[in-house]
């Protein structure tokens, strides 16, 4: 393996893609603050048992967890998702107090899953995750859905489908799981190898399998609606009424399940071009599972890479046009270089300036600035230098203006 080649399933961030990344993160962070969330950061690795307890039968633990022993033989794991670490953070730091509710936290960071790399699916991926603790009633769920809608709207992402289901509670899920196992067992040999393994421990995930979910016998499998009690059915109807009342388009999807074990109650996905771009739901039992402290909760997450992929072409053009305006300053004779190195320190108070550290001809300097992505080039020739001035050329509009050195040190000239 070439040590100068990045590992499989990860990507380098630079150029235009990094501009999109930073723009999205800035938008999301600003919006999250507006919706009352506080930012937190958790370690890249946690005790492996944290994920093994919260998602024992999920693929991210069974197959995809990056786990290892450190030099003291402690079993650790790179975080595959952010919800469980945020719960751990809130419990350990005593944020999970009733006086703090609703406690609204968000995290932006990299997650790690050992899975086969595919288009927009990486072993290291970046994710925004937000969580609300202390409530999980209809109104806080609606508020969370509206936040998700606003997030996609702020990014200019359209053409998605909102899918919703009600998983009720663990008792209901247990009954549904048993019914699915009984129903699907006669079809076991017609399932994929992965689904055959899931049939024993987690048959719900078969409904989410991209191959098996298209098969007619899977489509005809028992639905969770067959096991919902009167209260859960009423909750579903109330949610549908509220969504219709506020003109939020949705599809009620009876076979929608999430890939993580801790979800109960309402779950949802925003799907565009068959890819899930944002998803989440209620997980009322997770906090109690980890801390013995019953606390209702809900939240959602979205992958930054997938959001970038969903940006329209005109939106990407807009983002590139709003990136910081940077200038490459070139000198046409040796004596100017030493002076400009000191001057540039003052200019950088208001302007983004890079000094090219050797004498260069104008044409070569312009070609270099264009190749490196600069918006402006500053040219200092003998006449400019004697007048303590600089000629600045806009490489897009081709317009050029002469400024004094003092002007660059007093304001943004771009």
Curated annotation (Swiss-Prot):
Coarsely, its chief localization is: cytoplasm
Q: Does the keyword Cytoplasm apply?
A: yes
Q: What class of enzyme is it?
A: ligase
EC number(s) of the enzyme? 6.1.1.21
Provide any one GO MF term from the record: ATP binding
Tell me the Gene Ontology biological-process terms attached to this UniProt entry: histidyl-tRNA aminoacylation
Family annotation (CDD domains): HisRS-like_core
Record's subcellular location:
Cytoplasm
Pfam families recorded: tRNA-synt_His (PF13393)
Cleaved signal peptide residues: none
State the SUPFAM superfamilies in the record: Class II aaRS ABD-related (SSF52954), Class II aaRS and biotin synthetases (SSF55681)
Q: Give the record's subunit note.
A: Homodimer.
Q: Which NCBIfam families match?
A: hisS (TIGR00442)
Member of which family? Answer: Belongs to the class-II aminoacyl-tRNA synthetase family.
**What name goes with this protein?**
Histidine--tRNA ligase
């Amino acid at each position: 393996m070439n040590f100068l080649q990045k590992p499989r399933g990860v990507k380098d961030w630079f150029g235009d893609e990094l501009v999109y990344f930073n723009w999205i993160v800035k938008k999301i962070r600003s919006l999250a603050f507006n919706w009352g969330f506080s930012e937190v950061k958790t370690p890249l690795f946690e005790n492996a048992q944290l994920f093994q307890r919260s998602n024992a039968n999920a693929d991210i633990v069974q197959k995809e967890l990056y786990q290892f022993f450190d030099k003291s033989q402690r079993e650790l794991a790179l975080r595959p998702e952010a919800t469980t670490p945020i719960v751990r953070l809130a419990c350990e730091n005593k944020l999970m107090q009733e006086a703090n509710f609703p406690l609204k936290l968000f995290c932006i960071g990299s997650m790690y899953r050992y899975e086969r790399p595919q288009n927009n699916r990486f072993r290291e991926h970046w994710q925004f995750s937000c969580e609300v603790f202390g409530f999980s009633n209809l109104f806080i769920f609606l508020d969370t859905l509206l936040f998700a809608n606003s997030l996609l709207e702020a990014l200019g992402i359209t053409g998605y489908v909102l899918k919703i289901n009600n998983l009720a509670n663990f008792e209901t899920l247990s009954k549904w799981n048993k019914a699915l196992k009984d129903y699907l067992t006669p079809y076991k040999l017609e399932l994929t190898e992965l689904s055959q393994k899931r049939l024993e421990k987690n048959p719900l995930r078969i409904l989410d399998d991209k191959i098996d979910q298209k098969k007619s016998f899977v489509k005809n499998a028992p639905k969770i609606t067959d096991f919902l009690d009167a209260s859960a059915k009423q909750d579903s109807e109330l949610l549908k009424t509220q969504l219709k009342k506020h003109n939020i388009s949705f599809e009620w999807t009876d076979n929608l399940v999430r890939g993580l074990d801790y979800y109960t109650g309402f779950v949802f996905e925003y799907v565009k071009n068959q890819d899930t771009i944002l998803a989440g739901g209620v997980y009322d039992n997770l906090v109690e599972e980890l801390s013995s402290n019953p606390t209702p909760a809900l939240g959602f997450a979205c992958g930054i890479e997938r959001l970038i992929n969903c940006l329209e072409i005109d939106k990407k053009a807009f983002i590139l046009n709003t990136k910081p305006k940077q200038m490459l300053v070139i000198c046409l004779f040796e004596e100017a270089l030493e002076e400009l190195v000191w001057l540039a320190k003052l200019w950088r108070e208001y302007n983004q300036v890079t000094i090219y550290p050797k004498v260069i001809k104008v044409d070569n300097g312009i070609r270099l600035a264009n190749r490196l992505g600069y918006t402006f080039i500053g040219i200092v020739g003998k006449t400019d230098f004697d007048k303590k001035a600089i000629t600045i050329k806009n490489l897009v509009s081709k317009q050029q203006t002469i400024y004094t050195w003092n002007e660059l040190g007093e304001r943004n000239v771009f």
